[in-house]
Amino acid sequence: MPKQTPTIKDVAAYAGVSVTTVTNVLHGRGHRFSEETRQKVLRAVEALGYRPNQVARSLVRRRSYTLGVVVEHFRGALLGNPYFSTLLDGVLAEAVQAGYQLKIIALTSSDIEHVRQRTEDGSIDGAILAAPLHQSPLLQWAQECPLPCVVAGSSPPDLRATCVDVDDENAVYQGVKWLIAQGHRRIAFIAGPVNYWSAHQREQGYLRALSEAGIFITSHWIRRGNYSTESGRWAMEKLLQVRPPFSAVVCCNDWMALGALEALRRRGICVPEEISVMGFDDVEAAAVASPPLTTIRQPVREIGMRAAKLLIQQIESGTRTPERVIFPGELVQRDSTTAFAPETADTSKHPAAVRRVRRRRTY
């Protein structure tokens, strides 16, 4: 005799809660139950192998139970991009828990009519705009979209839409302040692409920290990359030609920092004894770099999860009051940075050569 398919009533009985509570948990209505109750329901779902009838739910509620994730200027390597793959992982985790699936809407341009055709055809219940470009027409679309919409990452502060992001400006500001406290005064910066708001904010954090410390800011210490390892190598080669030499460099993302490390290694420049290097993101490769990379961690997966949760709440409640959720960055100290001792400076090896007091690792 075939095993009977478990129902929502079976889940409720197993967890010792009402059917309504099970429904609220599966739909992500977190304000209506405790975390303990949520875990009981999820354990019951797993133990019984319960799967909601997606087709029946869609017919009854006239929903697709699908979240759209919109990515503009797609170049064919979405899952190979650590930022987007991690963001999607967070979105997917929250969506599946609430009984939703994902539809990736990869655009080769920022044409609003194109995105409307792909999102307003009834195939999705709401959209997450993933790290849009600065001044992208899609930002205007996010504010006017007839569907619930959340912007995840690289969101301008004046956007009239629900946004989930990291405090890019303050994160880099705190990182540069930490380097200054370690004795560094000549700090270079490898900036990101001008078409991302997040890159602009990180550069502003760098400039603010130097300005507040009374450090003269020279444009010669700033080179711009495109977030790739190769652009980080190129930028570092250019920076090594600058006079006066710098003692530390902050990079707008980890991949450019890894490229900078490679350029220094090719020149025979020791990190951190001669130049300290700091990145941003804390990708997996940062921890296994040589030396392990000091960086600023942003909670990309958590950003994706919160964006999906807020979007589902908008879909389920029918309300769309814009809100802005900002996560702090976190400095992760590894071996690519150390304290600077100006009295022991030695430029005999190359323009950027200096000696430093070695510090004990702290985490």
Regions picked out by a protein language model, each given a short descriptive name:
Residues 60, 119-120, 143, 180:
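Non-catalytic positions within long, well-ordered alpha-helices that form the structural scaffold/packing
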Residues 39, 48-116:
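Amphipathic helical "hinge" segments at domain boundaries
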Residues 21-23, 61-77, 178, 186-193:
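Short beta-strand segments enriched in small/hydrophobic residues
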Residues 1-3, 14, 47, 88-100, ...:
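Bacterial carbohydrate/catabolite-sensing allosteric modules
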Residues 107-111, 130-135, 255:
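Short beta->alpha connector loops
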Residues 1-65, 359-363:
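N-terminal helix-turn-helix DNA-binding module of bacterial transcription factors
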Residues 120-126, 243-247:
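Short acidic/histidine-rich motifs immediately flanking catalytic phosphotransfer sites
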